Amino acid sequence: MTARIALASLFVVAAVLAQPWQTTTQRWVLGVSIAAVIVLLAWWKGMFLTTRIGRALAMVRRNRAEDTVETDAHRATVVLRVDPAAPAQLPVVVGYLDRYGITCDKVRITHRDAGGTRRSWISLTVDAVDNLAALQARSARIPLQDTTEVVGRRLADHLREQGWTVTVVEGVDTPLPVSGKETWRGVADDAGVVAAYRVKVDDRLDEVLAEIGHLPAEETWTALEFTGSPAEPLLTVCAAVRTSDRPAAKAPLAGLTPARGRHRPALAALNPLSTERLDGTAVPLPAVVRTSVKGSVEHEAAQEAGHPA
């Protein structure tokens, strides 16, 4: 927004300097400046016009491009299948943002609800840049994937000790249709449309997540992604909803924001195996989450000494 205002200000200054607008050149400068300011600051259907045009063009390019799986060689993700998922797992999971000398870029809990059945995964992503010294201390060849898997196995053992069934998996379901066409409101395939949403993180978060599960949908996805440090974690929440019909332009619930024109990358990031962060801005934990997480994280961290990864 600041850059947009600064750019518009440059055109205003150019128009002022072109006074008294008597020559053809001066009038051209005035006209172009007025048009540029209007385009830069025009607001249409919830976003700036230029943003809308940019997203539309990017969407066209993605639809024309061949389906490829983008990978980041500097990041690795390990995924755990958890049965059943429970809020009591949150403190344990958040503690692994920085555990045994390894810092995770993100730790995520993902739920898929379809046909009355829930599947849940915990994903840990390690960034080599953030852990270069720790990785070099383990091996000269920078064992990123091996180290990530070790952290995942430690978390799996930790959860098993507390009574949950945990399995390290390599293949998972994904909310993004394999051969779907992206539209402004979602990604469409023969079975319907999947739309991605950002979820507002506030004291109503638990209520909104419960409401998502009760939507008249064939399939819903929700993901809670923790970043930052165990002491001061940040949270990003996203969701995906599959319906047989085209979704409305307006979000189905208060607290949801559609990923207008960005559904494909948003859904790709929702894949539990993705190394990318969720589409959205990470914010401090709301009180309803912070109360249950913080004390337990401090207790878990006290047990870390003497257990290097």
Curated annotation (Swiss-Prot):
What's a single GO CC term here?
plasma membrane
The source's domain of life comes to Bacteria
Query: According to Swiss-Prot or TrEMBL, what is its membrane topology?
Result: Multi-pass membrane protein
What UniProt keywords apply to this chain's record, in alphabetical order?
Cell inner membrane, Cell membrane, Membrane, Transmembrane, Transmembrane helix, Transport
* Pfam family, any one: EccE
| Location in the cell | Cell inner membrane
**Which spans are transmembrane here?**
5-25, 29-49
Q: What is this protein called?
A: ESX-3 secretion system protein EccE3
- The organism is Mycolicibacterium smegmatis (strain ATCC 700084 / mc(2)155)
